């Protein structure tokens, strides 16, 4: 299972789904092949692709992390993170929930076949959501990436990576249920190989002012073909900001 070397993850997906939306502890190692190891006490992001029960660590694509400012950050690979307790964690078919203790943010995850739906419940705070396309663990590393701000509620881009499986292409489009006030883009992380530049690892921070118990939904469609395909998947499968509806649909699919 999720303990020792069972190498499974606790997050949300539907049967045969392209999306496996799950927390990542943020640390490398044989025990964390799936991104999650039960004895760990940190979470450093919620990414949309995972392998279950394998002996090789890969994927972890399109990683989001909600925080309040100031936030906690450690040297890579952990980066921006929070502590958590299993007492504040719950999972069922197609659903996952955890409290990020350092920010008092409740995170809930569910999924459709090609989309991930996240619901963040914030305290009254200066809040942010990170999107880290540089985030990598174990065999996986970023070859190139891109983030485009379409408008104050929509972004899209891609992450190309290499690891256990070569030349993985994951395209995405993400919709926020609330406009972000500001976007801070870090494009200074250059990817090199054989002393030559091969790409850029994008990291973005989207800022919000939140009231107590305010909910923000972050919905992401993915595609292996194009950003346009990811957007079509998002609009086809998640047509409204209604987390409870999609959670119920995911549970129904499993049943």
Describe each model-derived feature in a short phrase.
Residues 1-255:
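Accessory carbohydrate-recognition regions in carbohydrate-active enzymes
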